[in-house]
Regions:
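Conserved acidic carboxylate
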Residues: 18
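Acidic catalytic/metal-coordinating carboxylates
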Residues: 43, 69-72
Length: 134
């Protein structure tokens, strides 16, 4: 039986875990830069499959997904992949924010968020320059 190789790299890779196509498109437009590689999955099982092969620098995680809640997935990711930064995004109320942060999310953004908010969060967590590429 062969072991799967897990790819790790210093490149700035971001995994977006979001089931809404429009939100994914918006995030892709906002975040497409030469120094960031974006990957996208639509559910938690897809995220787990992706993480078993490639570990990103940062995960943008929606809360309400077809196969579970992102807020519950945060603690799992932080235990198994402690170096991965997590930006939780949700349209739910402040109680979700509190739980997400308690579970280990590095930042929380409430939908709808602005381009500046998401870029500020990512730049801060990945130590990227403050200038805007667009």
């Amino acid at each position: 039986m062969s072991k799967a190789t897990v790819e790790t790299t210093t490149a700035q890779k971001i995994l977006i875990i979001e089931d809404e196509g429009e939100m994914c498109l918006v995030l892709n437009i906002l975040l497409s830069k030469d120094d960031i590689e974006l990957e996208h999955v639509k559910n938690l099982s897809g995220a787990e499959e992706h993480l078993s092969k490639q570990i990103p620098a940062l995960i943008i995680l929606d809360n309400k997904l077809p196969d579970g809640f992102g807020v519950d997935y945060v603690s799992y990711v932080k235990k198994k992949y402690p170096s991965v930064k997590i930006v939780m995004i949700s349209g739910f109320d402040a109680s979700v924010k509190d739980v997400a942060l308690e579970n280990g999310a590095d930042q929380f953004l409430e939908k709808p968020f602005t381009k500046q908010e998401i870029l500020r969060s990512i730049r801060s967590l990945l130590n990227l320059p403050e200038h805007d590429q667009r």
